[in-house]
A protein has these predicted regions:
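C-terminal-of-GTPase-core extension/linker across diverse P-loop GTPases
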Residues: 3-211
Length: 211
């Protein structure tokens, strides 16, 4: 991919001298890759990042390293191999999540209340899968918001910082076009009210979000 791009840019440089900076950058990236390193570990300025992003290079994409451990070690913080994976991930500016696939498989067959008791018995506050999902959302700059009604409660995934009209558009394009305002509440606050919007409204926790 890089070699083709460099060749094409070199040909076009005769007509556009401003492409020289791009060629120099891609040459630098090519040398970096030949040393066996990932592009995401390179130090790049904002302009260079924008250029590289357009290349769709696999080793520039954000990653999370997942360390699979045994059930006996899932609650321990002293696993030598997890430490090594975490140290390697940090060289790329990446995160590391520890899970026990065996435990996750067992929990998949349990009801929600049974899962909580299962985790308590193991001395774990949060499942590895939940940690991985949260880390993935953070890495991709995503959040979820919930809509609730008589038929169902549903989660919608949006990019962090998305405005209310565009968030509504995730449900249906008509909602974005005709958006006036939405009533919202933080999830934790709603849970504190026992899931009751009436109680939340009485406590002044409902916010009205306009455009």
């Amino acid at each position: 991919v890089l070699e083709r791009a460099i060749t094409k840019l070199n040909k076009n440089m005769k007509a556009d001298k401003t492409l020289g900076k791009q060629v120099a950058l891609l040459e630098r990236v090519k040398v970096w890759l030949e040393t066996g390193k990932c592009v995401r570990a390179m130090e790049l300025d904002d302009e260079e990042k924008e250029i590289i992003s357009s290349m769709d290079l696999l080793t520039y994409k954000p990653v999370i390293y997942v360390a699979n451990v045994s059930e006996d070690e899932v609650a321990s913080e002293d696993n030598e191999y997890v430490s090594k994976v975490s140290e390697f991930a940090s060289t790329e500016g990446a995160g590391c999540v520890k899970i026990c696939a065996e435990i996750e498989a067992e929990m998949a067959a349990l009801e929600d209340d049974e899962r909580e008791l299962f985790l308590e018995d193991l001395g774990i506050e949060e499942s590895g899968l939940d940690k991985l999902i949260k880390a993935s959302y953070s890495l991709l700059n995503l959040i979820s918001y919930l809509t609730a009604g008589e038929p169902e409660v549903r989660a919608w995934t949006i990019t962090k910082g998305t405005k209310a009209p565009q968030a509504a558009g995730k449900i249906h394009t008509d909602f974005e076009k005709g958006f006036i305002r939405a009533e919202t509440i933080a999830y934790d606050k709603l849970i504190e009210c026992g899931g009751s919007l009436v109680k939340a409204r009485e406590q002044g926790l409902i916010r009205s979000e306009g455009k």
